[in-house]
Amino acid sequence: MLDNKKLFLNKSSVNKLMKGLLNINQGKSDHISIPFISKPFIFKLIEQASNLHFRKAKTLVGNSVTQDFEVCFPAPRDGAIDTLATSIESLFLEAINSLDEPPIKSPKFNDIAMQRYVSGSVGISPHKDHKKYISVIIIVTLSGRSNFCVCEDRDGINAKISDDRPGNILILPATGFKVINNVFHRPIHFVNNIRDGRLSIGLRQNSEIN
C-alpha cells in the first residue's frame, strides 16, 4: 500500500495486479480494482489538488459524449501526484516482470488529469477513452461518492458498478492490451449518481507524446 511520504509495494498488491492482468487477457474481466493508497496519502493528493487550476469541461465532446465536471489538464507530475504515478509504475513493473507472458509493457504515465464533480452532477455519459492511450488507464477517486460503471454499449446496457472507493486504483485496459482471442475492445464506461461530489485523478500513457 502506498503511504504518506514513502513507497511500499506489498506482495498482496502485486499478486492482485498479476491476477487481474491475466483475467483481462483471458476475457474473464474488463477491469481491475486494487486497494493501494492510504488515507494520509489521499489527503496529500487532495491538498495538492486544492492548489491547482480547474476549468469547466466542454459539455459535449467526441461521439456525443456529455460531460458535467471541472478539469485540471494537464495536471502537473510533481509532488504527491508524481509519487502516486511513480508508485503505480513500480507496481506494474513488479507484476509484469513476474509474468511469463505479460499482456502489456510497463506503463509510463505522461498524461494526467484531475476531474472535480459537484454533488448532483450528471457525470459523464458512456464512452471509450481515445485509442491514442495505450497499455492501461488508471482512475483514482480521492473523495466523494459516485458510480463508476463499465457497460456494453453507449446506451449503458448491462452496466456494472466498479469498486473505485478512495484508496483503490481502478485499472482499465487500453490500446495494445493483448487478449487471448486477439479481439480487443476498449471498455465503455461512465460516471453517474454523484453524491457529495467527486474528485478523481486519471493517469494515462499517450502514444502521441514522446
Task: Enumerate the predicted regions with their spans.
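Non-heme Fe(II)/2-oxoglutarate
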Residues: 2-105
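Short solvent-exposed loop/turn micro-motifs enriched in small/polar/acidic residues
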Residues: 107, 132-133, 155, 184
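A short glycine-rich, His/Asp/Glu-containing loop-to-beta-strand
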Residues: 108-118
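Short, conserved beta-strand element in jelly-roll/cupin
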Residues: 116-119, 132-148
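Short Pro/Gly-enriched beta-strand edge/turn motifs at strand-loop
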Residues: 120-123, 172-173
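Glycine-rich, charged/polar anion/phosphate-binding loops
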Residues: 124-127, 186-188
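A short beta-loop-beta micro-motif enriched in histidine and acidic residues
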Residues: 125-137, 157-158
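Catalytic core of Fe(II)/2-oxoglutarate
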Residues: 149-210
